Amino acid sequence: MSPAIDIAIVGATGTVGAAIVEILEERDFPVGQLHLLASPASAGKSVSFKGRNLRVKSIEAFDFAQVRLVFFAAGQAVTRQYASQARAAGCMLVDLSGALPLQQAPRVVAEVNPQVLEKLEAPCQVTSPASQVVALALALAPLRPLVRWRHLGVTACLPVSSLGREGVAELARQTTELLNGRPPKPRFFDRQIAFNLLGRVGDSDTAGHTGLERRLVEESRQVLDAPELKISVTCLMAPVFFGDSLSLAVQASQAIDPSAVRAALERAPGLELIEPDDCPTVIGDAVGQDVAYVGRVRTGVDDACELDLWIASDNVRKGSALNAVQLAELLIKQGR
């Protein structure tokens, strides 16, 4: 048993922050004092942890010298504002916002590239990548001995919880209005999300790509250690509360053996292969689980060098909170 360490969770009242609290308890993480931090508006709320009710504190007055490990589960602006304070206090940082540069806080998926952690200088900074990258990396990493990638094509259907509690509340409100015969009035989203599919998540740059799409490309390349890999990404917002659904098309430089691919996926950690005659879904399979699900493994209709997959994963749990806690466990195991 590792010695107990004092921990802070920034963004503790959000969907991911709350999931981190739950997973720390479930995995019997060696927690000493747990400090739950949020904005002043959320300060004073109560969160249950190991049979105790912990009071949420305002991050504005918090002294990071009180803790050894900090999870940043808030937005990028909050991370940019407070990460330097935590690092100056000598804390290990596990970021989930993607605010820190790739070179300073490398993106790591626990089952894919944990060796990166061994090279970090103290105090360590590491980033748990976007939940969609976690799902993609879990499915792609086992295929490296079998498939020489030339290009990845990704269509990612995101749930409204990827934008936090506000997204969840907005979908619930719009759905209720429609089912009661009232036209929904968009507030959080710029148009109707209930019973609809939005073809863009966030603002586009001059080339037409969103910040999230660029993030997925950059983080996937780093996690897979494939800096030159060509990746095309389209992110959609789906009228789903929780769970990422991804369509992945891999263009290889040689013909692909689907049987060998299935065998590799079946052995892969953090992944569950669904039978060929079935298809994983976020509601029926992925949500609440500690693995990502992959199915519909097949080659292209008329191209033996194309591999197509369908992936379903819990964006809050497997894709975010669990990976962050696993990274912290690895750092502690290394004696950081």
From Swiss-Prot:
Span of the signal peptide: none
Q: Which Gene3D superfamilies match?
A: Dihydrodipicolinate Reductase, domain 2 (3.30.360.10), NAD(P)-binding Rossmann-like Domain (3.40.50.720)
Among the GO molecular function terms of this UniProt record, one is:
protein dimerization activity
Alphabetical list of InterPro entries matching this protein: NAD(P)-bd_dom_sf, Semialdehyde_DH_NAD-bd, Semialdhyde_DH_dimer_dom
- Its Gene Ontology biological processes? amino acid biosynthetic process
CDD domains this protein is in?
Answer: ASADH_C_USG1_like (cd18129), ASADH_USG1_N (cd17894)
Sequence similarity: Belongs to the aspartate-semialdehyde dehydrogenase family.
Question: What is this protein identified as?
Answer: USG-1 protein homolog
